[in-house]
Swiss-Prot record:
One Pfam family from the record: GCV_T
Reactions this protein catalyses: N(6)-[(R)-S(8)-aminomethyldihydrolipoyl]-L-lysyl-[protein] + (6S)-5,6,7,8-tetrahydrofolate = N(6)-[(R)-dihydrolipoyl]-L-lysyl-[protein] + (6R)-5,10-methylene-5,6,7,8-tetrahydrofolate + NH4(+)
Protein's name in the database: Aminomethyltransferase
Subunit-level organization: The glycine cleavage system is composed of four proteins: P, T, L and H.
């Protein structure tokens, strides 16, 4: 099967990017090298093409009323011009996807529009799960992205760079805030969507725009010495920041409580949602495993599937692992038996038949200091 290509594919070729198959898309794993790209984001700014991700539009009168049942988080806890990170659950409380929902407000004829930014590998599952569990007359569900480009400008200088590009201030927009507006000097008739969000632990923006406007932003960024970045750096940045990767750290067999996402479950809101009974039971009885962070001694990397031991007892499994360019240390996430999931608990990680010392830590290995 032919791989899907981003509208910016020609820019990858110009930049000699190394390309890989990711969720059916031919995407750059790196441009100048993972470490260099990672450090560019941590020190100044980097630009990612994340057009492989899905964007679902949900329209209707009070659409939150209809889609609330898919999410354990109270959808009325955010309003127009804001975004909300949450998880979509199956009927057993397992995570179908983690995503961000944006409220674009009332557009026309009292119709409110919500945008759901979902993982590339889960777009079809998400779309069908919503569609199959809603009355078609209640609400409109469509693929919003179509031929558009989704870019992520990330790093401590990202806000200044974006303000220069749009020739306008964004200081009034809070974190997880968004706007959907026309910038005449960029694309006179095009509404550009952008939000103060990201997947790196730094300040950042995610921008949905036409191919023409995206090329404009790409070229502008390169002219300002912003590093084009690939999926490799995106993975190490998100791991340092303590952010989950769907299919590795979370899936339909893991619950929000197990994944350290219990703060997204608003049982006190009393709204019905898929999996509520299972999560009520977990809240009452506790969980058997918990996602934690690990520092691993030496330079060996604990990859997905590596066993975590306490003495000779198998107490867990690594889900994600990498060398941390910022910490200069091997780091990982692992699901650990709850009784052993204690901060500073010393464990062993089995890597290629050898045991390496590990120490359980909080899942966020890095936090920005500005």
């Amino acid at each position: 099967m032919d791989l899907r290509k981003s509208p910016l594919y020609s820019k990858y070729i110009e930049s000699n990017a190394k390309l890989v198959d990711f969720a059916g898309w031919e995407m750059p794993i790196s441009f100048s090298g993972l470490i260099k790209e990672h450090e560019s984001v941590r020190s100044s700014a980097g630009l990612f093409d994340i057009s492989h991700m899905g964007v679902i539009s949900v329209k209707g009168i009070n659409p939150k009323d209809y889609i609330q049942k898919f999410f354990p988080t109270n959808l009325y806890s955010f309003s127009e011009g804001q975004g909300l990170y949450t998880v979509m659950l199956n009927d057993k409380g397992g995570i179908i996807d983690d995503l961000i929902i944006y409220d674009l407000g009332i557009q026309e004829n009292d119709i409110t529009e919500l945008l759901l930014i979902v993982n590339a590998s889960r777009y079809e599952e998400d779309f069908q799960w919503i569609k199959n569990n809603l009355n078609k007359d209640e609400i409109s569900i469509t693929n919003f992205k179509k031929a558009k480009v989704l870019l992520a400008l990330q790093g401590k200088k990202s806000f200044d760079l974006f303000e220069e590009w749009i020739d306008s201030s964004i200081s009034h927009i809070p974190n997880f805030g968004c706007e959907y507006k026309i910038f005449e000097h960029i694309s006179p008739k095009e509404k550009i969507f952008f939000s103060k969000t990201g997947y790196t632990g730094e300040n950042g923006l995610e921008i949905l725009l036409s191919k023409k406007a995206a090329i404009n932003l790409w070229d502008f960024s390169i002219s300002k010495n912003v590093a084009p970045c690939g999926l490799g750096a995106r993975d190490t940045l998100r791991l340092e920041a303590g952010m989950h990767l769907y299919g590795q750290d979370i899936n339909e067999e893991t619950s929000p409580y197990e994944a350290g996402l219990g703060w997204l479950v608003h049982l006190e809101n009393n709204h019905e949602f898929f999996g509520r009974r299972f999560l009520e039971e977990q809240s009452r009885l506790g969980i058997q495993k918990k996602l934690v962070g690990l520092f691993i001694e030496g330079k060996a990397i604990g990859r997905k599937g590596c066993t975590v031991l306490k003495g000779e007892e198998n107490i867990g499994t690594i889900t994600s692992g990498s060398w941390s360019p910022t910490k200069q240390q091997a780091i990982a996430f692992a699901y650990i038996n709850t009784s052993h999931a204690l901060i500073n608990n010393e464990v062993q990680v089995l890597i290629r038949g050898k045991k390496f010392k590990g120490v359980i830590t909080k899942r966020a290995f890095y936090k920005k200091n500005y």
